[in-house]
Structures are given as structure tokens and as C-alpha cells.
Amino acid sequence: MAKKEKKPDYKAHLFSFKYLLFDIVKWLGFWQGLIWWRPKVKYDGEEAKKKIKGKAVVSSNHVSFADPFVLQCTVLYRRWHFLFMTDLIKNKFQKWIYKNVFLSFPIDRNAPSFKTMKFLSEYVKGGNLLALFPEGHIKRDGVVDDFKGGALLIAYLADAPIIPVYHKKRKNPWHMTRIVIGKPFHVKDKIGPVLSQDKLNEAAKELHEYELHLQQLCEEDVKK
């Protein structure tokens, strides 16, 4: 009799030896992160202020390599998972650091497969928080580029909300890092039961427009 294949456990756990190294690094290092970046968070309405519970995909603009650390300092009560581009990895040790210390998953920026998207959606479905940068590259000027559809596809397959985030790159180290967290964006409600490329593109465009709105809120906050 053939052995039943054991399904992987993607369920989020409050405590797990799997995440022990990450948790130690996070709680030892977040004080330095708070002091260095000094995040000042603004919310787009009361709904955006609610705690991020259960499965969710965070969609953020991408201004520097430090973005994952900035986001982690913004919402300390959750374990964040990120993606790392395989072309950035030079050796096995780097790969181990990304996977075990930063809880990141490898992805090919030139050809992300549907299999990868399916895995990520299953991981999110287990109650995890995945952060993505849908611009697909770093934009140091803070101007938000068009969004690719990967974040929306993962959120759709996981039936998870997208939490839009905008953060402004500070000009000087003594400035605070300004961050705006938006209302949950429910992809399933936007697209409906039947997924198509056109509907995915429309939803990506709508999410991009909302990100521009968050950028405007951030700029207004800076002027105050």
C-alpha cells in the first residue's frame, strides 16, 4: 500500500521552533530599528487602524533594500514573510539567511511560475502575512510605478485581503520615516468568482490608484 503523502503545514503558529531564530533577531533588533527609522504611521480611516489578523497580503511601494525592516518595525505583533529575487543570491549561506532569518521565499523575477504563486497563496491561506512590492523593482524617488498582478493573484487564490501601505523615503537620517496604512482591499470582491487576466489588470489598476491616494496623504502629512 502506497504511503499517503503528508501535506505541508502552512498554518501560522504563535510559537514555533521553526521561527525561533527570526523571533530572537526581531525582538533583539527592533529597538534599534525604531530608533533608527522612527516610523510615524498615519491611517486612512478607522478601518485601516484595525489590527492585521489572520491571512493577509501587504502591498507596498519599494524605495530601498531596507523596506522589509521598516515594515517589520511598523507592525511588530506579526511575523512578516517576504520574497527575495534568486538573482541577488551569491551563495548558499546568503540563501539560508534570507530563508531562516528574514522568513523570505525565493522567486525568479523574470519568470515567476504559477506553481510559485500557488504555493505562496497556500502559505497565506494558513493565516500568514506576506508582504510584496508589486512595482517589481526599487523606486528611490518614491513615485509609485504601475503594479504587476502577482500580489493580487496570490491574494485572490488565498481569498485574503490586501493591506495597501505607502512609505516615503526620508532625505536625512534625523527625519522620521512616514508611513500610511490603507483600508483592506478585497480582491475577491473586485474580481468575482471567475478569474481573468482583464479583471486582474483592472483590480491592479484600482489598487495602484489607491496607492497614489496614500502617497498624497503622506505628502500632505509632511507639509503639516
Range-by-range predicted roles:
Residues 46, 87, 109-111, 135, ...:
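Proline- and acidic/polar-enriched loop/turn elements at helix boundaries
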